[in-house]
Curated annotation (Swiss-Prot):
S-adenosyl-L-methionine binds at E43, E68, D95, D117. Catalyzes the formation of N(7)-methylguanine at position 46 (m7G46) in tRNA. Its EC number is 2.1.1.33. It comes from Staphylococcus saprophyticus subsp. saprophyticus (strain ATCC 15305 / DSM 20229 / NCIMB 8711 / NCTC 7292 / S-41). This is tRNA (guanine-N(7)-)-methyltransferase. InterPro entries: SAM-dependent_MTases_sf, tRNA_(Gua-N-7)_MeTrfase_Trmb, tRNA_methyltr_TrmB_bact. The gene is trmB. The keyword S-adenosyl-L-methionine applies.
């Protein structure tokens, strides 16, 4: 369900410049923004932020970036960060296509893609976050041993992503064809994931690296 547009969202986000980058002011100096040398994990398309804020709370030794282009959605993430007093998470309000403007080559240790828009129509293939254009960006910002963790309830997108990544020269270290049936204790659910798994939807997951 698409969140209703909130005309006041931009002003709300601008009140927390130490947490939120809405204008590219921290582009190219993300590590300096955190002011430490901890590993950086990114979630592209964070939605309401349940996944990444839960992860950040569990792992204070890691720096997290929530990248979400919709300002009306990002305010939900910001509220969670403030309410939980998290200091190891920053928010970037921009599109994934701008990744290499924000991150230096090899600066990121892990990238999460959770329940991305499947863009099912063939003419929209290039918009999928596992299309080769995006994979090239991920390869650039990830460390040599960096990982992509991907989850979806869309079988078509999962199959496409496996093929797209394979053709790009990636390999898979883990593939789950029914995540919740396997009872993975390390799994952290997104809001979307909980909603659809409760309805019996199968959740697909994989972890991948570049050769």
């Amino acid at each position: 369900m698409r969140m209703r547009y909130k005309p006041w969202a931009e002003d709300y986000l601008k009140k927390e410049p130490n947490i939120v980058d809405i204008d590219g002011s921290h582009a190219g100096r993300i590590s300096e923004w955190f002011d430490n040398d901890q590993p950086i994990y990114i979630e592209v398309g964070s939605g309401r932020g349940q996944f990444i804020t839960t992860l950040a709370a569990k792992h204070p030794e890691i720096n997290f970036i929530s990248m979400e282009r919709e300002k009306s959605v990002m305010i939900k993430v910001l509220d969670k960060v403030i309410e939980q007093g998290l200091t190891n998470i920053k928010l970037i309000c921009n599109d994934a296509i701008e990744l290499n403007d924000y991150f230096k080559d090899g600066e990121v240790s892990r990238l999460y893609l959770n329940f991305s828009d499947p863009w099912p129509k063939k003419r929209h293939t290039k918009r999928r976050l596992t299309y080769q254009t995006y994979l090239a960006l991920y390869k650039q910002v990830l460390k040599d041993d960096g990982e992509i963790h991907f989850k979806t309830d869309n079988r078509g997108l999962f199959a496409y992503s496996l093929e797209s990544m394979s053709q790009f020269g990636m390999y898979f270290t883990k593939i789950n064809l029914n995540l919740h049936e396997e009872d993975d204790e390390e799994n952290i659910e997104t809001e979307y994931e909980r909603k659809f798994s409760d309805k019996g939807s199968r959740i697909y997951r994989m972890e991948a690296k570049f050769h």
